[in-house]
């Protein structure tokens, strides 16, 4: 199911997807990427994504999205890759509460919130497990409207190999610290 609606640049809306059975799907990465004109998404909150390992670029460059459905209860326990997840969602002011997502297996968070330049705050992702993450490059790069971040000082960054431009172009003064420096 990866890239199923990818590059539908003029698509403004989608039909009801709530009844889609994706319980055996392992990759939904890029499903809505490059849907530049998509304003909102149908309800996908009840999707069973327990077997999904890849959601990279799921909403990548959905420039016109002004809100997202509630994806807070998704079972993310098998996901390994969230890079480019919300990349370029320039009009999103807030995100669903993804604070309880299971991030134990995630290795790549790079560019996840890149250029979400209307976001004022993020859900409390301070309890995300990051001990398997190896890349957080540009994770918050271009989030120029952020006035605060959750306390990510408890993130375990000991295995991170790539971390350049994490807060690049975050214009507001953010008080930042991490648990360890590798």
Model-identified regions with their sequence ranges:
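Negatively charged
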Residues: 1-182
């Amino acid at each position: 199911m990866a890239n199923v609606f990818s590059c539908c640049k003029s698509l403004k809306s989608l039909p009801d997807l709530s009844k889609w059975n994706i319980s055996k799907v392992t990759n939904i990465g890029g499903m809505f990427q490059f849907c530049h004109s998509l304003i909102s998404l149908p309800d996908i909150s009840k999707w069973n994504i327990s077997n999904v390992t890849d959601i990279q670029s799921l909403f990548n460059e959905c420039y016109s999205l002004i809100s997202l459905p509630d994806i807070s209860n998704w079972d993310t326990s098998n996901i390994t890759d969230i890079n480019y997840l919300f990349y370029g969602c320039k009009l999103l002011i807030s995100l669903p509460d993804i604070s309880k997502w299971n991030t134990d297996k995630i290795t790549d968070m790079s560019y996840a919130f890149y250029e979400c330049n209307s976001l004022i705050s993020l859900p409390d992702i301070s309890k995300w497990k990051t001990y398997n993450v190896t890349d957080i490059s540009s994770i918050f790069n271009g989030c120029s409207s952020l006035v605060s971040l959750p306390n990510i000082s408890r993130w375990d960054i000991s295995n991170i190999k790539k971390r350049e431009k994490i807060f690049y172009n975050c214009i507001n003064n953010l008080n930042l610290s991490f648990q360890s420096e590798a």
